[in-house]
Amino acid sequence: EPQRPAPGHPPPAGAVCLTGAQKPAACRCSRQDPKNRVNCGFPGITSDQCFTSGCCFDSQVPGVPWCFKPLPAQESEECVMEVSARKNCGYPGISPEDCARRNCCFSDTIPEVPWCFFPMSVEDCHY
C-alpha cells in the first residue's frame, strides 16, 4: 500500500502537479485600454478557458478581443497601468532607489516614457 502522509502534514513535494497558468491580477486586466488588447483566445472561448491560459476576459466591449493578454506584471499591483497613464514622479536618469524613496513605481523597459511614476490605487481594479 502507498505511504500516506500523517494527518495534518502536507503530501511530499511533487505529489500533485497542476498545469496551467494563473488568472492574472485584476489591475493587469481592467487597466488595459480595449483598443490595445492583443487576442489571447479563439472565437467562443469561455472566461474559464481564458483565465486558465493566463489571460484576461471581458465581454463588455464590442469589436475588440474578449480574451486578451494582460498588462505586464509589476512589482506592485498599484504600478500596473498603461504606459500612457504614467505620471512622472522623477527626473531623467533617476535610479530605482531614488524612485523608491519617493514611494513611486520604477520600470525602465520602455524608452521615451517616465521610468519613475506615481502608483495608482487598486480600488478601481476588477474583472
From Swiss-Prot:
Pfam families attached to this UniProt entry: Trefoil (PF00088)
Tissue expression from the record: Found in pancreas.
SUPFAM superfamilies assigned: Trefoil
The protein's role, per its UniProt record: Inhibits gastrointestinal motility and gastric acid secretion. Could function as a structural component of gastric mucus, possibly by stabilizing glycoproteins in the mucus gel through interactions with carbohydrate side chains.
Keyword set includes Cell membrane: no
Name of the protein in its database record: Trefoil factor 2
Occurrences of domain P-type (ranges): 27-71, 77-120
GO MF, any single term: CXCR4 chemokine receptor binding
Major localization listed first in the record, in broad terms: secreted
Signal sequence bounds: 1-21
Organism: Sus scrofa
Modified sites of kind Pyrrolidone carboxylic acid: 22
Superkingdom in the source lineage: Eukaryota
CDD domains xref list: Trefoil
Subcellular location: Secreted
Key words of the record: Disulfide bond, Growth factor, Pyrrolidone carboxylic acid, Repeat, Secreted, Signal
PROSITE patterns: P_TREFOIL_1, P_TREFOIL_2
GO biological process: chemokine-mediated signaling pathway; maintenance of gastrointestinal epithelium; negative regulation of gastric acid secretion
Disulfide bonds: 27-125, 29-56, 40-55, 50-67, 79-105, 89-104, 99-116
InterPro entries: P_trefoil_chordata, P_trefoil_CS, P_trefoil_dom, P_trefoil_dom_sf
Gene Ontology CC: extracellular space
